[in-house]
């Protein structure tokens, strides 16, 4: 039941479903010695709520209790990557490969290698997967990861081809949102609304629609922007952590408020250090006329290391 509510929360962007997922665990929510299956679900719920420290603690307990649990290592790698612990993420991915030679482990390692500028990583994973029968859900995820790898490496034609297939294949809206970002970055806002027309109206989807409609001077933009403003408004004047990335980008690209965007992007960087977060902080610092505010990104590029042609162009 908890997993079902969490899946709905991810798919529909409905906060109530995440709360129901937590409630479904009952007393297990606060017990450190929960069964491994419960620890995995609890970690996923915490990850969804951006409690990455709590999620990793649960996953550490899970792999301590069952060191051969592939899903625990995969989830651990994903959160470590999100929080910028790239070396630890690679170690977790290697555990997956050692345990099962799982495709996801190889994709994870290739993704991390591409972040270090390994131009051959994309081709290696493509060769490994060529001709293999993979389920639709896994295929959509893998194609999206490959597309993001290609984009970071500056291989835009390959990225677009992969994004297009991923958007048609993957469940949920993540692939379509990622493709929408690609289109927006290449001045193709006119293609975004059709791409997202049937996507669940999550905050991420609405943000891309707002950007596209605004850039194409579509009269529907005002209503979408108003809905986003309502959703992202912090309760009682308090800014939480769940929507920091979306709030920062909304402030920067929709509202044109670079100072607020920089504050939000800086706070977001303290939690999440994915390429999208680095790009956001660098862009906000540049727009606000405060290049020194992008220093944490420059440091991250040096150690643990992050190669992204978009980021290097932005920081020049």
Task: Map each language-model feature to its residues.
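Register position in tetratricopeptide repeats
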Residues: 7, 48, 82-83, 115-116, ...
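Residue-level recognition of tetratricopeptide repeat
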Residues: 3, 7-10, 44, 78, ...
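Canonical tetratricopeptide repeat
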Residues: 41, 75, 108-109, 145, ...
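Start-of-helix register in tetratricopeptide repeats
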Residues: 3, 37, 71, 104-105, ...
